[in-house]
Swiss-Prot record:
Coiled-coil features, chain-numbered ranges: none
Protein known as: Golgi apparatus membrane protein TVP23 homolog B
Region: Disordered, residue numbers: 1-21
Pfam families to which the protein is assigned, alphabetical: DUF846 (PF05832)
Organism: Pongo abelii
Name of the gene: TVP23B
Subcellular location: Membrane
Annotated positions of the N-acetylmethionine modification: 1
Membrane-related topology note: Multi-pass membrane protein
Length: 205
């Protein structure tokens, strides 16, 4: 079902077409997609390692910069198009309609029952840990480069923040839905808390 946010032209939809829906499997702790899990971490961790060791590995700033940007670009593509879909059943993308208007679409695979899960808990932990931790490190690198006046590295670090931050934002939107859904979730939560508190007060009195 499509839910369109009129404020920012985004859509929250069920994940993929019918032909991409695989048979539901029990949620297990084991890693079901080892290759995807490896490359989910490989490019982003490699970019961080090269950034930290670049002055020791090479005296050429251009070589280090190009290597880091290539790793960040490969990571952005792999996480956006492959690992999110396989590891956690999420995907985000953009499409332009017939009127030339751009729409952002955030997809999530809906599981039919609590017993039949398609997402491995181990893969989910790997996915979200890598997705959150690496952008945080790039933000730290950005402040470090700024305060140490390493201006030439600032552009590279900002590239890391932007590319990995974009994937983080996109997958958070896939996970929790649009701002409208967030508002309704918050309203529902506080409403339940208020009702529970009033019910408890009535029982004690």
């Amino acid at each position: 079902m499509l839910q369109q946010d009129s404020n920012d032209d985004t859509e929250d939809v069920s994940l993929f077409d019918a032909e991409e829906e695989t048979t539901n499997r029990p949620r297990k702790a084991k890693i079901r997609h080892p290759v995807a899990s490896f490359f989910h971490l490989f490019f982003r961790v490699s970019a961080i390692i090269v950034y930290l060791l670049c002055e020791l590995l090479s005296s050429s700033f251009i070589t280090c910069m190009v290597t880091i940007i290539l790793l960040l670009s490969c990571d952005f593509w792999a996480v956006k198009n492959v690992t999110g879909r396989l590891m956690v059943g999420l995907r985000w993308w953009n499409h332009i309609d017939e009127d030339g208007k751009s729409h952002w679409v955030f997809e999530s695979r809906k599981e039919s029952s609590q017993e039949n899960k398609t997402v491995s808990e181990a893969e989910s932990r790997i996915f979200w840990l890598g997705l959150i931790a690496c952008p945080v490190l790039w933000v730290i690198f950005a402040f470090s480069a700024l305060f140490s006046f390493r201006v030439k590295w600032l552009a590279v670090v900002i590239m890391g923040v932007v590319l990995q931050g974009a994937n983080l934002y996109g997958y958070i939107r896939c996970k929790v839905g649009s701002r409208k859904n967030l508002t309704s979730m918050a309203t529902s939560y506080f409403g339940k808390q208020f009702l529970r508190q009033n019910t408890g007060d009535d029982q004690t009195s």
